[in-house]
């Protein structure tokens, strides 16, 4: 059924390093792979396999800050790590789920920073930080995009994740009724948060 949405964008988030904390911004360039710099970097293990909070929950403590020509990463007990937008090192091949993806290694300093912070005491890990190769075309699963060719970088599935304040409010009402604490929108790692629409109307948007 046709319907009109009078929605406004209330919040914008990017997640420069896959599975690390996001950063809220007032504006961001929309590109064919999603918001600029979203999931542009990723942590991989010694075999080039992607690493996420599913294996290492401490990744959530790594907080980015976007500056003019760099992203700055901070974590408890660590010196800040500065990643220049225009700096990469050798080309590598890495894996995200079933996809083999072209990327660039970000060098030994970044690798040591992530290895030091994310390793458990007595269990050192060899981790590397890589950046997506912009010449590589990684398609979202056509099964989930209804046949539309949607490009993304290191995201799990889609160029953008859209949520709404209405859906969050409805969820928190149900949580409260069940005796649970409310959750914030950050729990769902959206890129775009919409205001002014009913719960779950974002699922009906044909963009």
Where are these regions (language model features)?
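Small-residue-enriched flexible connectors and coil-helix boundary/helix-cap motifs
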Residues: 1-207
């Amino acid at each position: 059924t046709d319907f009109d949405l009078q929605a406004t964008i209330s919040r914008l988030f990017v997640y420069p390093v896959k599975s690390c904390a996001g950063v809220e911004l007032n504006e961001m360039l929309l590109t064919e792979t999603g918001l600029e710099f979203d999931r542009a970097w990723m942590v991989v293990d010694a075999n080039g396999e992607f690493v996420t909070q599913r294996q290492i929950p401490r990744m959530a403590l790594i907080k980015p800050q976007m500056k003019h020509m760099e992203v700055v990463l901070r974590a408890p007990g660590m010196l800040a790590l500065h990643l220049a937008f225009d700096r990469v090192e050798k080309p590598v091949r890495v894996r995200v789920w079933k996809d083999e993806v072209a990327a660039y290694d970000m060098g030994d300093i970044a690798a040591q920073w992530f290895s030091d912070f994310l390793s458990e005491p007595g269990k050192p890990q060899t981790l590397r930080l890589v950046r997506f190769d912009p010449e590589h075309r990684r398609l979202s699963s056509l099964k989930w995009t209804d046949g539309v060719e949607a490009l993304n970088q290191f995201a799990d599935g889609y160029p953008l994740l859209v949520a709404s304040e209405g859906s969050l409010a409805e969820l928190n009402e149900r949580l409260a009724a069940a005796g649970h604490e409310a959750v914030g929108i950050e729990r769902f790692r959206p890129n775009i948060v919409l205001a002014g629409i009913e719960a779950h109307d974002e699922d009906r948007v044909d963009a």
